[in-house]
Amino acid sequence: MNEGYDKIVEAETQNFRKLWFLDRYLANHDGYIAGGCFKDIFNGEPVKDIDIFFRDRSEFDRAKRYYERNEDFALAYDNDKTIAFRDLKSTSGIVIELIKKTFGEPIEMIETFDFSITKFAYYMEETPFDNEEDEDDDGTYMKNKIAYHKDFFEHLTMKRLVIDNKLDHPLNTLNRSWRYAGYGYGLCRESKEKLVKALQAVPEREIDFGKDFYDGVDW
């Protein structure tokens, strides 16, 4: 574990069967899934959209080409932040969003998310074989892994919005807290105080509640 991410837990996926359907969306590219869809999955709610992130632009470009050529998916929309495809085989009409505005490693990425209940990632990691006889030419294989905030499940059950890192874009965070409030989630006392202090430091000229607060990380 990276010492800089001491609040993040890493684990294998064999005990998380309800996540296995996500393998369909990790096939044939090197992206990873992160963000709000895990809240819906663990709450037993329908998953409407899945956010797929990438370590760099070239990974995004390869995934984009794959979905453009895949007849099981249809273009849903495209803007400067994401390109989205609808899964035509999904009974619930799942839309996958390929994020093209921000890039990084899975744990690095979820650490930038506002709330602990969004800090969850599902990804593939190159892993050495335990048995040398099973090794391929590289001596490694791809293993499914997850990474999540250590309090993810507790805060999800309590419907608590907890901010535990620096607020670089407090207006964005405020906007997202309103959205989550519509689903019954509320800021804890400490997070309210942190958000208020951060908002007080925002220059008045930058405050515009009618604008789109999205700044590339809206999960």
Where are these regions (language model features)?
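Catalytic cores of the polymerase beta-like nucleotidyltransferase superfamily
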Residues: M1-W219
